[in-house]
Design a protein with these regions (language model features):
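Bacterial N-terminal signal peptides
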Residues: 11-19
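Mature catalytic domains of secreted/periplasmic carbohydrate-active enzymes
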Residues: 25-397, 402-403, 408-410, 415-417, ...
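Sec/Tat signal peptide C-region and signal peptidase I cleavage site
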Residues: 20-24
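Aromatic, loop-rich ligand-recognition surfaces of beta-strand-rich domains
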Residues: 338, 345, 350-353, 383-443, ...
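Compositionally biased low-complexity segments at domain edges in trafficked proteins
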Residues: 507-511
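Bacterial N-terminal signal peptides that target proteins for export
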Residues: 1-10
Length: 620
């Protein structure tokens, strides 16, 4: 008698396996959402932090913008060491370096064959040096990427403003792109046109920065010669990156990596991006570790504190932007020891804060998982990979990730990253922590009223007072399409002391300060009445901090003992003051005066000068 096997359970199991396999095959990957980054943009955004190095004749003339007639003989550093620059930048957490190969004065840090206004006519190395080449080699040696800043504006060149200068400009750009290896970024400054030396004419030349340089042709040359480079351009044709509208070191708490391909870009779009833009143009936050971009000994006591640098990090990298942090080269040809120590301390603090992700020892679940597939499970957000992500089903634009700690846990930082290879999606989210038996809403303490839990992008970091909780809910309240979250992090950052203002400064609150003018030009001057005559030798002007209106860009300074008879002390330009509204310092031979008047010969916008503070240096 034959034994008849019961195959029903086996067949059921095989059918179940086949069904699961079929379901797995039917779960498609999410479609892209709007514009997405190209390979170069993605690589740049993944760098997060890289250094700016400002170095030129300005270093030795104590200026921010050279006029173009400065003597190359002043350029003779005694301790110049590009390897020290690179070691410092690497220790400060920077992944690359951008050098000001030529600033507005026109002086070149490489021996360009197209001009005599370069280091080949300086005493340094008897004119045989090449700082661009030396730095490119040092970056390669230490594993950092290298890039160049080339100012389109050249206040030295006789042909600036004429068609022949564009050829000169491209010839110099070609030298930089073909002689120094791979370039990760080409940086074109937005300052274009104005007064200058211009071969000895000493005149003002204005250009249309959108058309004069013929940017499309220049871009084609860059793409051909350096196909891995991104282009930063605040002066014309849309580049691969955008300026964020300020040099103070912050971008908007809402920050879309999108703009339109063409058209004007108002300040709001620079700072916040454009939610429905048709081009991927991420923000790059550029700021200096000192008030100015070039080295000034007077700023040795004004290097950004550790707490200020961390604030800058949270408001740039932590808001879906890269951070381009400037280290000015000092007169010895080195990154100053003060700047170096502060930059390295900054890197160590970032490492300390983000080295221990508390979420990786917790359990994470999601309210929705795409197709219930392990490929898109919530566990992906704590696997330390940028190539995996949690995804929700199509049509789901609200979802929650819940982090359950194995014991009450103290934390004060939350980090999230979208899988931006498929676009930027999330437009609003919230955080709630289970403290005891109560759910508590967490607010961003770096934003007024805690608002601003909106966009995420490449990385978003939220700071809040330390709490002790057993669960944390990351609630996505709105998303353009199904949300894709690559990583989340929960951290406990140490407390940092707040900045303490410098002591001993004599501020304008001690004086009578009024805005005055004439019948023809009302409100053009700032008048300081010290109530009695004093010996003065300096004047400081702090522009308005929350508006671009009323900023004095060109000035004259006058003194008087009686308020009727005035003597001009000095006049000139406050370079780059609109973009970087820091203290503007004027020093002069000690003179006796009761009244000081700062005239706004030109102001940025509006018809009335404005100020945040005034300081007078009174001789004792």
């Amino acid at each position: 008698m034959k034994t008849i096997l019961n195959r029903t359970p086996l067949m059921a199991l095989l059918l179940q396996i086949a069904t699961l396999a079929a379901n797995a095959q039917s779960i498609t990957a999410p479609e892209p959402c709007g514009p997405t980054p190209n390979v170069n943009q993605l690589a740049l955004q993944n760098m997060e932090e890289y250094a700016f190095l400002h170095y030129s004749l300005n270093t030795y003339t104590d200026m921010e913008w050279g006029y173009g007639n400065e003597n190359p003989a002043v350029f003779n550093p005694t301790k110049l060491d590009v390897r020290q620059w690179v070691r410092t930048c690497k220790a400060a957490g920077m992944k690359g370096i951008i050098l000001t190969a030529k600033h507005h004065c026109g002086f070149c840090l490489w021996p360009s064959e197209y001009t005599e206004y370069s280091i080949k006519n300086s005493p340094w190395k008897n004119g045989k040096g090449d700082i661009v080449g030396d730095l490119a080699k040092a970056c390669h040696e230490y594993g950092l990427k290298f890039a160049v800043y080339l100012s389109p504006w050249d206040r030295n060149h006789a042909g600036y403003g004429k068609p022949e200068y564009v050829t000169y400009f491209r010839n110099q750009l070609r030298e930089l792109l073909t002689n120094y290896g791979d370039i990760f970024e080409v940086w074109f400054d937005g300052a274009n046109g104005g007064n200058g030396y211009y071969g000895g004419t000493n005149e003002t030349r204005m250009i249309d920065r959108t058309t004069y340089y013929q940017w499309p042709e220049t871009y084609r040359m860059i793409r051909q010669l350096q196909p891995k480079a991104v282009i930063w351009n605040d002066g014309g044709e849309r580049g691969d990156l955008r300026w964020v509208g300020t040099e103070a070191g912050n971008v908007g708490e809402t920050n879309w990596s999108l703009l339109n391909k063409t058209g004007d870009v108002p300040w709001e779009q620079l700072h916040y991006g454009l939610e429905n833009g048709n081009a991927w143009v991420p923000g790059e936050t550029n700021t200096s570790i000192r008030p100015g971009w070039f080295y000034h000994k007077s700023e040795d006591d004004h290097v950004k504190s550790l707490s200020k640098l961390m604030d800058t990090y949270y408001k740039s990298v932590g808001r879906n932007s890269t951070l381009l942090l400037n280290f000015p080269i000092d007169r010895d040809g080195l990154i100053n020891p003060i700047d170096s120590a502060r930059g390295i301390a900054f890197a160590r603090m970032v490492e300390q804060v983000f080295s221990n992700n508390l979420a990786q020892r917790a359990k994470v679940s999601a309210s929705n998982v795409r197709g219930n597939s392990r490929t898109y499970s919530a566990a992906n957000v704590i696997d330390k990979s940028m190539q995996t992500y949690w995804a929700a089903d199509d049509g789901v634009t609200k979802a929650t990730l819940t982090i359950r700690f194995n014991k009450p846990t103290r934390f004060n930082r939350f980090m999230a990253q979208e899988f931006i290879q498929l676009g930027q999606r999330v437009s609003k989210f919230s955080l709630k922590a289970l403290v005891g038996s109560k759910w508590v809403s967490l607010k961003d303490e770096l934003v007024d009223n805690g608002d601003g839990l909106t966009t995420i992008g490449r990385k978003r970091i939220i700071c809040f007072p330390t709490i002790k909780a057993t669960q944390l809910k990351f609630i996505i309240e709105d998303s353009k399409k199904c949300p894709l979250i690559s990583n989340i992090g929960v951290y406990l950052a140490p407390e940092l002391s707040m900045d303490i203002p410098n002591s001993g400064e004599k501020f304008a609150s001690k004086f009578n300060v009024t805005i005055v003018g004439s019948n023809d030009v009302p409100g053009k001057s700032i008048l300081v009445d010290m109530e009695q005559s004093k010996m003065v030798s300096g004047f400081r002007y702090l522009p308005p901090q929350n508006t671009r209106n009323g900023i004095i860009t060109h000035y004259s300074l006058w003194t008087s003992e009686n308020g009727n008879d005035w003597t001009k002390v000095c006049s000139g330009e406050f370079p780059n003051v609109v973009n970087n509204p820091i203290w503007q310092n004027l020093t002069f031979k000690a003179t006796k005066a009761r009244f000081i008047r700062l005239d706004g010969e030109q102001i940025s916008e509006g018809d009335r000068v404005l100020y945040s503070d005034i300081d007078v240096n009174i001789n004792k």
